[in-house]
Amino acid sequence: VKVNTLRERISEYEKIYDYRFIRKLPIITVINGRSFKKTTSLLKKPFSEDFLKLMCYTMIRLLAEVDGAVFAYCYSDEITLVSRNDQTHETEPWYNGSIQKISSATSSIASTSFLMSALENDINLIGDPIFTSSSFVVPNTMEVVNTLINKQQSAFNYSVHSACYFELLKKYTYDTVDDTLKNLTSEEKIDLLFQETGIEFNSYSSSFRKGAACYRAPKLIDHQDGSQEIKNKITIDADLPTFSKNIDFLSEIITGKNILKL
């Protein structure tokens, strides 16, 4: 077999499955913890500040490492990363838009960052944290906003169920709790939570109820010589507004209107 012929044939196999995104469209990457119910079983339930710390550090690393990343949003063990490659005519997509490479790289960055932060902060996990990742494009920035609205609505429903589930487990068996919560709406679960435990759902932290985000924003920097300057810095926002009621908040970040033009 001729070496060149073999190389070309194998290369053709690879090219067939090297799917790429259409250029100049926003890329959404959804990164999920694999088997995190077991991995995080030693952490406080229903809400853990330690876990939030790990997820926030992971978002920071993703925003810093992924070309074109402008916004990251997390709730539970899921991170939604928004990347753009249409800011200028010359802007190129990360990894030339290769779906496989974008997904594999983001899952690797998330896994190593989460583990590194856990080790540095002495946070106990069961086994090694592993993230999976999938990516897709949406037609415009308005659909990016709608994607994030949908994610935050899912976060609300998840946090309501999680709060109700784990607080009721302090009084009842697993089977009883499962049967009690079955087919209840989020509003009914909130009422049940208060009736059974006296806990107001809104007393939980905003980051548990609405999720947390990471993005670049202008910050005033103080220098040792007494001077000051404004720079764009990656920031964590753990007190988010309700996206559906504050669309401008998301739009300004996604479109870069909140960024200082240096």
Q: What is the predicted role of each segment?
A:
Residues 1-262:
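Regulatory and interdomain segments flanking nucleotide-handling catalytic cores
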